[in-house]
Design a protein with these regions (language model features):
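Catalytic alpha/beta core of large soluble enzyme barrels
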Residues: 222-302, 329, 370, 798
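N-terminal catalytic cores of NTP/NDP-binding nucleotidyl/phosphoryl-transfer enzymes
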Residues: 34-95, 148, 157, 218-220, ...
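Short, solvent-exposed turn/loop segments enriched in Gly/Ser/Thr/Pro and often Arg
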Residues: 35-37, 45-46, 79-92, 145-153, ...
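Alpha-helical support elements that line or immediately flank enzyme active sites
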Residues: 57-59, 282-287, 496-504, 641
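Feature 926 captures the class I aminoacyl-tRNA synthetase adenylation module centered on the KMSKS loop
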Residues: 203, 395, 399-455, 459, ...
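Residue patterns forming the tRNA-binding/recognition surfaces of aminoacyl-tRNA synthetases
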Residues: 4, 9, 18, 22-26, ...
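Non-catalytic terminal extensions that flank enzyme cores
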Residues: 1-55, 78, 335, 348, ...
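Secondary-structure transition/capping motifs at alpha-helix termini
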Residues: 69-77, 98-111, 131, 135-140, ...
Length: 888
């Protein structure tokens, strides 16, 4: 058979570049807008245009590519929609940093010129992550690549905003929002990360105006007292019932503020009395609304004290805090200071402490949208996998707050709202108006703010398919089939896509949502530059190849568990790649004389037991891989493939058929083995292709030289004809006997080259006959000089015994080893291990060590203990075997 020879070793970089270009040239990634095939579609979670490929991207996109290649091979009209996100604040920050190197700010350029500069930056650097995804092997339909600031997507954004506004779901109002003093913009609740930090609780005396004493107020933020407008107590607190309605003097500021009663106040926090600062706390803001309190802003957009701060004007908030505490102490208002640990909200982009601030913002009235999105999951229209995330989704949707969608930056979708400067008429339009609809004047001023980046991302499943136009792509691929994303953006993105998809399209945006976990280091720690534990995906691809890297990511993706990654694990699967390559080389060499067409008539009676067995095992593997992928159990699918290819195909089947392949005595039997070998190899490659696309294409083109790509060949399907439990049991028994003989050889330290004499005793004739069929396999793979198989045979003297179910295996020991010297060797080794075990167990029993040592060190010692204990068990078994031999 004229099949191409394989190189000595697999060269991943050469193969990756060659085959990716080949797939692109043949348009294999393209999906048809109109097709008779069933559609399967995925929209990519668009990476930031500023982004570089990190481990989270690598995992997310490897899983998507596995699914899209799998479904494409199953015959679906499979679309993987690619694109990037404009990433408002992140991108603006990057470009502002570039300007700073030139000694410029965005204000020096002005809005229009600055936006031009961002577009220029996007054109120069925005495609980096796309090229990196291609290196990973991602088979997106690149002809459809979208960007969230594309003209078409911008049109969709405006259209949805206008619809929401006219439906009464968008409003503008003064509200307390999370303000980032570094990014100079409001951010949503979801964009705030909370970090537990040590701080202080200051107890401050507020004297009554009438001189009748004072009330003690506890606060973690004394600088905000500059904006206090009341002191609040619980209406049911007996300590303060007669104090409600009185006035106190606000220290430092020296103005009168009232004592009010509100149910929000908890009686057991501090003294039970709290200061109310409406402009600096969302709860205080709500209380101020109920009690009609004045709202006094004390900070500017950079968290610097403004003109309302009196002598503290111009001070940073934390410097102001120190100065106010000093002044309170000096003036006799500070009663005490206590250590206090509390959660500090930080901007998830720049890690600056967020400042609650009152400002005029645009909001979406979210409850009506959330209700429909919640119901869709309850009714099963969208399935969340793993299901454990459903409870989190429901809880969040039930307690959702209105979404602040305006951002005080320049890069992004500018809010499509105009105000007439003549008559103050507000115009909300999906197109730029040229005149006022009220007074017909032409002097219009557009809203300065842009929309939250997540607003455009929420429209991604339908805007990328051409909406608001009713395109063929939209009709074919919406709702999409699957969304693969990290659980950390379930609320940022998934929930919002659900709400917008149902609102705009009247249907869910996807049928399934698979939420994968985070990629952590081997110890389970988050990867970070400061810890020095970051793994660079591109370096891993350079060093080990994309196939080994992809397979590692999938193999460690177990539902509900973080992906623990290390370079050693990736290297381990590089060995798997090498194993497949070497097995293929062996196969190709032994298929050289196989007929050009493999459609030869193979008689069933010429098929050997290993031929029948490997087909049964392959059929089970097909079922397990399909089941694993259909249920997003990527680790199970990988585990089945690894077990079958490495252990069953390479370690067993190839070894079992070598005598048949090397011999010319039985041509029909040899051809049957060749036929099975080729079919199993081809099917295995197809199963493996979604995980290892480059390796499988390289091999496929050598063994199936008809010019077709493996990526468009049919995916295997399980076949009931190959379900044969009897064959499986028979082969497993023979394999277990071979393994037991090998173990005995190892236990008594016999060289693999030393031929053995073995007696195998079965409990009945039927089982003896089955074993007799496997006689040659046992002789060859256990390296036997002689084997006797019978029923209820007597145990020979001087033999080592092994038990396999109801079968006894006796290995003759006479003349093979010096029992005395072997016993001495074992005793010496066991004593050494016992000594090491004692040292490690004492260390693990030491409370000081367990309390002070790092988790990784403790784990290392525990692993060492287990390894030593396992070795001791093996040596004990070998010693018993020797003693058994002496007795018999």
């Amino acid at each position: 058979m004229s099949r191409g020879l394989l190189n000595k070793a697999y060269e991943p970089h050469e193969a990756e570049e060659k085959w990716y270009q080949y797939w692109m040239d043949h348009d294999y990634f393209h999906a048809q807008d109109a097709s008779e095939k069933t559609q399967f579609s995925i929209v990519i979670p668009p990476p930031n245009v500023t982004g570089m490929l990190h481990m989270g991207h690598a995992l997310n996109n490897a899983l998507q590519d596995i699914m899209i290649r799998f479904k494409r091979m199953q015959g679906y009209n499979a679309l993987w929609m690619p694109g990037t996100d404009h990433a408002g604040i992140a991108t603006q920050n990057v470009v502002e940093q570039e300007l700073a190197k030139e000694g410029l700010t965005r204000h020096d350029l002005g809005r229009e010129k600055f936006i031009e500069r961002v577009w220029q930056w996007k054109e120069n650097y925005g495609g980096v992550i796309i090229n990196q995804l291609k290196r990973l092997g991602c088979s997106c339909d690149w002809s459809r690549e979208r960007f969230t600031m594309d003209e078409g997507l911008s049109r969709a954004v405006r259209e949805v905003f206008v619809r929401l506004y006219h439906d009464g779901l968008i409003y503008q109002g003064d509200y307390i929002v999370n303000w980032c003093p570094r990014c100079h913009t409001a951010i949503s609740d979801l964009e705030v990360e909370y970090k537990e930090e040590p701080g202080f609780l200051w107890n401050i005396r507020y004297p009554f105006v009438d001189g009748s004493g004072d009330i003690i107020v506890a606060t973690t933020r004394p600088e905000t007292m500059l904006g206090d407008t009341a002191v609040a107590v619980n209406p049911n607190d007996p300590r303060y019932i007669d104090k409600v309605g009185k006035e106190v003097i606000l220290p430092i500021v020296n103005k009168r503020i009232p004592i009010i009663a509100d149910d929000y106040v908890t009686m057991d926090f501090g003294s039970g009395a709290v200061k109310i600062t409406p402009a600096s706390d969302p709860n205080d803001f709500a209380i101020a609304g109920r009690h009609h309190l004045e709202i006094i802003k004390i900070m500017d957009g950079s968290a610097v004290i403004n003109e309302n701060g009196g002598i503290y004007q111009g001070q940073d908030r934390y410097i102001c805090r120190k100065n106010i505490v000093k002044d309170l102490e000096k003036q006799g208002y500070l009663i005490s200071t206590e250590p206090y640990t509390h959660n500090i909200g930080q901007c998830y982009r720049c890690k600056t402490d967020v400042e609650p601030a009152v400002s005029k913002q645009w909001f979406i009235k979210i409850q009506p949208l959330a209700k429909a999105a919640n119901a869709a999951v309850v009714k099963g229209k969208t399935r969340i996998v793993p299901t454990m995330w459903e409870a989190t989704y429901f809880e969040w949707m039930s307690n959702i707050r209105d979404w602040c969608i305006s951002r005080q930056i320049w890069w992004g979708h500018r809010i499509p709202v105009w105000t007439c400067e003549n008559c103050s008429q507000v115009i909300v339009s999906s197109t730029d108006p040229d005149h006022c609809t009220g007074c017909q004047g032409s002097s219009l001023r557009q809203e300065e703010d842009v929309l939250d980046t997540w607003f455009s991302s929420a429209l991604w499943p339908f805007s990328t398919l051409g909406w608001p136009d009713q395109t063929e792509a939209l009709k074919t691929f919406y709702p999409t089939s699957l969304l693969v994303t990290g659980f950390d953006i379930l609320f940022f993105w998934v929930a919002r896509m659900m709400m917008m998809g149902i609102y705009v399209m009247k249907d869910v945006p996807f049928r399934d949502v698979f939420l994968h976990a985070l990629v952590r280091d081997e110890q389970g720690d988050k990867m970070s530059k400061s810890k020095g534990n970051i793994i660079d995906p591109l370096k891993m691809i350079d060093q080990y190849g994309a196939d080994a890297f992809r397979f590692t990511l999938a193999a460690f993706t177990a539902q509900g568990r973080d992906v623990r990654m290390s370079e050693e694990r990736i290297e381990g699967y590089k060995y798997f790649v090498n194993k497949i390559w070497n097995a293929t080389k062996f196969s190709v060499m032994n298929l050289e004389d196989y007929p050009e067409t493999d459609q030869v008539g193979i008689r069933k009676d010429e098929e050997s037991l290993p031929d029948r067995w490997i087909k049964v095992r392959l059929n089970k593997t097909v079922h397990e891989v399909i089941s694993g992928l259909d249920e997003y159990r990527f680790n199970d699918a990988c585990g089945s493939l690894y077990q079958f290819i490495w252990h069953e195909f390479c370690d067993w089947y190839l070894e079992l058929i070598k005598p048949v392949l090397y011999s010319r005595d039985h041509p029909a039997r040899r051809q049957a083995a060749q036929h099975t070998l080729l079919e199993v190899l081809k099917t295995s490659l197809k199963l493996l292709h979604p995980f290892m696309p480059f390796l499988t294409e390289e091999i496929w083109q050598k063994i199936v030289p008809d010019g077709t790509s493996i990526m468009v060949s049919p995916f295997p399907a399980a076949d009931a004809r190959f379900e044969d439990p009897d064959t499986e049991k028979q082969m497993e028994l023979i394999m277990d006997i071979i393994t037991r003989i090998r173990n005995i050889r190892g236990e008594i330290n016999l060289a693999p080259s030393k031929k053995l004499k073995v007696l195998v005793s079965a409990p009945n004739k039927a089982l003896a006959a089955i074993l007799d069929e496997g006689r040659d396999y046992i002789v060859n793979l256990a390296n036997l000089e002689e084997i006797t198989i019978g029923v209820n045979l007597e145990e020979p003297k001087g033999s080592a015994v092994g038990v396999v179910g109801s079968v006894r295996v006796y290995v003759f020991m006479e003349g093979l080893i010096d029992i005395a010297s072997e016993k001495a060797r074992l005793e010496k080794e066991m004593n050494k291990i016992a000594k090491d075990l004692s040292i490690v167990s004492k260390k693990l029993a030491n409370r000081d060590f367990m309390a002070r040592a790092a988790e990784a060190i403790i784990k290392k010692e525990e692993d060492k203990y287990k390894d030593l204990r396992d070795k001791h068990v093996v040596l004990e078994a070998a010693m018993k075997k020797l003693e058994q031999t002496v007795k018999s």
